[in-house]
């Protein structure tokens, strides 16, 4: 019996495992940032067309942004006097002229042939050749960001006077248009406006928009905190919709995209903008506390849940946008709870660059457009992967320009963040990272009172990326006909699944983040099924996770089977080893059954990581077996699952089970 898993998923895991220890180090200086940018540039170089004078990224709306992002890299390289592949003044001159001379820059409104297009003029379209291509805020903003850097580097690049004048005109005319001027706003995405106002000030020397319009945007944003944030400061993508809208469950990517306005805050203050003060300043510090603790993991990857589901989840190009919040926070400690948070932000950025660098090294090219083999809607092609690489390369250049190569860096301690209204707990430590999402509001398949995913300290999948049923952690109770009466890992029904924070103890207060460093975090939840209920408790420490389940009949009759599941990742490459109390080891076969009595521990060996299950407690007669879960969209690389049968038959009324999980323990890795 074999478990099939997409080859790409296994290769991705092996690539990360082999490359990460050397690549994902923190504390980058300018030399490290340039080394990364040079390597990314070499991978993107084949896209350059000498005839056309542009990078051909593959169409689909990404070409103007990709070209502007690489213009940004070339411009910072010139500004800093860098010598290496990232420096190419001739290409920069050609790109700067091309981006303001005809498509993508337009001065007449494109024909409204695309229903979702944000039509306006002047502005930029999403094609280097079609003046009627779709428009969106991000197309303007990313192109303008690159042009602003080129303008700053105009002397080092020896830009022709005509190109400089056209950059100044295009940026200024666009920023002054109704599409961008106050009170214009797209949802609550103030970051794009901050970028445009800052670019206008850069190319014109006139900071009116930066002083006035950005100040008004920030005031409106923080005055609308009830619409922009849920309890615990989780982000709401649709501020004018119900908090229970599926897209408002949270959005790690958009929260950080909006938070990237911090890149321009210091420039605005120097230009005379009034500082955030009073309630807005307090909210800002709570938001950054929640964002760093709740949206990022120690390897520098997102602790990712998204109300937009497969439209955004694990998309590489969104990582490149989200990282800009880390650049801004690392460079603007005055907006954070304290200076150490800025040092942590830099560490997360640096490790994230290292993580991506390792993927690129092992793949021998540009990493995939979507990580961990999950599906995407719409399907993300190679052009999306190239845009992601350009964005992440540009972040290294932005970090250099922001002075992060000389800024302090520190590894964060174990961090947690809790959102009371949806029962989301995010946990990240140097050893592992995970999350519990009690209520998913229908945004994605996974969720419930259990670990929604489990990664090790290198962002290797240890157990799951978002499984359900037997591919998830948690308890399941079925009747004699196989009908499911209860599953603790089911996030669809908020009324029957509640999660509360036991330690540390907080009162639920709007405008406050329940987040920060920890040594001991505990949550408890209760799930009601059909005639059965469950009480679940989890304790998180920097090194381990301790879980307890108490299952009770509440009216269900006849024979019932209760199990607790521990999943793996990697298809047939994953395995499970049982160790008895005498130290004898046995690799379990699919379908085999084993008494739990006499076992000391289980080692769940996923493709690139591992975890140990020990301190097992279960009713007498409990058994375990290895089963093959079905393939799932949110967990495509599922390996075999350890299923512990803790109660069966018609006579049991309650069953109590406990276990400890230690991720990536040294003895496991020594044996692999």
Region spans (language model):
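Sec/Tat signal peptide C-region and signal peptidase I cleavage site
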Residues: 20-26
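Extracellular polysaccharide-recognition and catalytic grooves
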Residues: 51-67, 107-119, 128-136, 144-149, ...
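Extended polysaccharide-engagement surfaces of secreted carbohydrate-active enzymes
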Residues: 275-279, 292-575, 580-611, 618
